[in-house]
Each structure stands twice: as structure tokens, then as C-alpha cells.
Amino acid sequence: MTMQDKEPSAPACRVIVITSGKGGVGKTTATANLGMCIARLGYRVALIDADIGLRNLDLLLGLENRVVYTAMEVIEGQCRLEQALIRDKRWKNLSMLAMSKNRQRYNMTRKNMMMIVDSIKERGYQYILIDCPAGIDAGFVNAIAPADEAILVTTPEITAIRDADRVAGLLEANDFYNVRLVANRVRPEMIQQNDMMSVDDVQGMIGVPLLGAIPEDKNVIISTNRGEPLVCQKTITLAGVAFEEAARRLVGLPSPSDSAPSRGWFAAIRRLWS
């Protein structure tokens, strides 16, 4: 049995919204890479691109040419959910659902969003990650409606941190008690020169537990242009290892960097946290 055939048991489907408030901080990149990592650990994962009319998740996964039907067509009765869920060819236990086609605007309601997620749950998926639209308008409210947990993505920049802190407050107001932080595009050399806030500083300002710290890495741009998640590249990268570490923490598995020696990849990841 291969790893992609093996499916660890999970007590219930976990629905996690990945949000940021501010656009351009790497939220969709985090969704694609965390989702791929969880699938590679053997779980059944569905990724939902909830950005109506401005989807990008399919590009990062290399699935843009396979989007024929979307969630809106499922809701309107034009196709079945199985037709809209696109199964990844690399890992069969990973699927993606686009909410709409680009340049199409629909009125996605909370009720419709809940219905779609409930239907995916019924098909045996163990993790559903929702890529939330940027901003805090109706798209945000609808995207968080079916979720039980949230991952807040930010960068160590004061504008992004302020927006992330605002979103953290909105999540708390909507009864989210399991919220974790991903600090993205961390640059250790700038932190050492006091030109960038440390990950500990970012976490302290926002006040939610830290799930992972992802270093700035040019390979993220390369992988995006190739339509392949960074964690699928043959070359090991520090950012890729950091995403894998965050995914292991998310599913409750031991993290190698937590007990890493003073040298090596995992030690480098651990140093990002401080």
C-alpha cells in the first residue's frame, strides 16, 4: 500500500478556513502547500477556493485547465459535486473545488456555503481547507461560516499585522476559539539587523498560537509559475520544510524541529521562530 492510498483515521472532518484580511501575504500559497502536505500524510483533503470571480488556487496546483464545473453550478443543479471536485493526479486523496469561474460574479450565501461543505463532508473527506477571500466583507463572512477552525496568515509588516489582528478579533466575535498563526515571508537576516519584527513579536502582537513560520524563498515564485506546490519539488527548500512542519503540527503529529539538533534543516526552521 502506498502512502497516497493509506488514509489515517480521524475522529471527524475538520473544516479550516485560511484567512488573512490583507491580500498578497501568501494565503493561497499556504492553502495549496498545507493541503498538499496533509494529503501526503495520507489524509483525504478537499481544498475550496472561496474567492468568487478571482480564483487562483487552481493555478498554484496546476489544475486550471481541468476546471469545467464549479460550486455555483452544483448549487444551481447543473452538475453533481463529483463533477466539480477536481482530483489531483499526483495525490489522489487531494481534491480542489472552485466556487466560480473567473470573471463570473455570483451571490454566494452562507447557506449555500454550508451546503457545499456538508456535501463534501458526506463524501469522507477528513480535512477541508477553505481559501478565504481577502478583506472582511460578505465574502469573508460566508467563507468562515462552515468552518470550525482558522489559520491566520500574515507577514512581518505592520500593515499586514494590523489587518491580521483585526481579523483575529472578527474570528473571536464569530466564536472561533481554535485560531492559529502562520508567519509568512520571514527574513532572518532582516530580523538580526532589527529591520523586521521577529516571529515571536508578530505572534505576541496578534495574540494567537503560532502554527508555523515560513521563510522568504524565491522557490515559491518558481513553483507558482510552474503550477506545482513548493512541497512537491524534488529539491528540498527551507520554505518547503517549514510548510511540512506546519502541516504535521496541524494534524497533531510530532514536529522534528521541536527536538532538532543545533544544525541542519529542522534547526534552521526552529531558529525562524525567535
From Swiss-Prot:
Q: Where does ATP bind?
A: 22-29
Gene3D superfamilies from the entry? P-loop containing nucleotide triphosphate hydrolases (3.40.50.300)
* Disulphide bond pairs: none
The cellular component terms of Gene Ontology attached to this UniProt record, alphabetical and capped at eight, are:
chloroplast; cytoplasmic side of plasma membrane; cytosol
Q: Which InterPro entries match?
A: CobQ/CobB/MinD/ParA_Nub-bd_dom, MinD, MinD_FleN, P-loop_NTPase, ParA/MinD_ATPase
* Gene Ontology biological process terms in this record: cell division; negative regulation of cell division
Q: What keywords tag this UniProt record?
A: ATP-binding, Cell cycle, Cell division, Chloroplast, Nucleotide-binding, Plastid, Septation
Where does the protein end up?
Plastid, Chloroplast
Family matches, as Pfam families: CbiA
Superkingdom classification of source: Eukaryota
Q: Which family does it belong to?
A: Belongs to the ParA family. MinD subfamily.
State the protein's purpose: ATPase required for the correct placement of the division site.
Q: Which PANTHER family match?
A: SEPTUM SITE-DETERMINING PROTEIN MIND HOMOLOG, CHLOROPLASTIC, SEPTUM SITE-DETERMINING PROTEIN MIND HOMOLOG, CHLOROPLASTIC-RELATED
Protein name listed in UniProt: Putative septum site-determining protein MinD
Q: Which gene encodes it?
A: minD-A
